[in-house]
């Protein structure tokens, strides 16, 4: 399982979410994807807004997603 975190350098909420991610301890790997640098990948996952988190199972199938900033506690719950 892994999480793709779609964001952009100009996105203030993305920076807020990254700060929260940096402050947690999780066994789930979180890969950052810049929508400006990897627009095709963002289109592949139908990202309509940032920040967007997409959780994938081991086969690459989407399990769930979240659009917007989460609190630390909500993020930890979402990662379960």
Question: Whereabouts are the PLM-identified features?
Answer:
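Local sequence-structure signature of Cys/Sec-based thiol-disulfide redox active-site neighborhoods
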Residues: 1-24
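Thiol-based oxidoreductase modules, predominantly thioredoxin-like and allied folds used
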Residues: 5-6, 25-40
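Mobile acidic interaction elements
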Residues: 12-13, 22, 39, 45, ...
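Structural micro-motif
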Residues: 45-54
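Non-catalytic, surface beta->alpha helical segment in thiol-disulfide oxidoreductase systems
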Residues: 55-80
């Amino acid at each position: 399982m892994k999480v793709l975190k779609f964001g952009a350098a100009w996105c203030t909420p993305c920076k807020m979410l990254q700060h929260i991610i940096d402050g947690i301890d999780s066994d789930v790997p979180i890969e950052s994807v810049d929508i400006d640098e990897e627009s095709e990948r963002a289109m592949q996952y139908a990202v309509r807004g940032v920040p967007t988190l997409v959780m994938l199972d081991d086969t690459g199938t989407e399990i769930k997603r979240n659009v917007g900033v989460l609190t630390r506690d909500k993020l930890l719950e979402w990662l379960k």
